[in-house]
């Protein structure tokens, strides 16, 4: 049971943060975001909850694996910091509708996730590889945020 908790609790935390972020996004997603100029590479709206669900599971599994393997607390703290920065992006971009601060935040998030992957890879390759889909999605999101900032 304890081993199961190593994985379940981080996954639930990711979904809780994601649901909290969606609370602050809802009005902007339905009223403001559709009016913005977006690039042709913008995924359909239905892709976002699917992608984030997969990403949250992978993020939680990554931390769970680190905890189970007894990795140092620095990596867990880094995981937590990137989750907070991820949440802040939703506030900055959607709730405050500040495209510039959203872009700064997501660039910071890109860096934090890259650092996490590179540091975790040295200790636990599987845990690092679980973050790769998240990093790739973030790169797309960074492109989208940058485009929206430049053309709106």
Predicted regions and their residues:
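Core segments of transmembrane alpha-helices
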Residues: 52-63, 82-85, 109
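N-terminal signal-anchor transmembrane alpha helix
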Residues: 2-24
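Membrane-interface helix caps and helix-loop-helix hairpins in membrane proteins
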Residues: 91-101, 148-152
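Membrane-helix boundary connector in multi-pass membrane proteins
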Residues: 93-99, 115-128
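Short aromatic-rich membrane-water interface segments that cap or initiate transmembrane helices
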Residues: 38-50
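Terminal transmembrane helical module of multi-pass membrane proteins
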Residues: 125-152
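Non-cytosolic membrane-interface motifs at loop->transmembrane helix junctions
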Residues: 35-38, 99-108, 130
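Membrane-interface helix termini and inter-helical loops of multi-pass transporters
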Residues: 27-40, 150-152
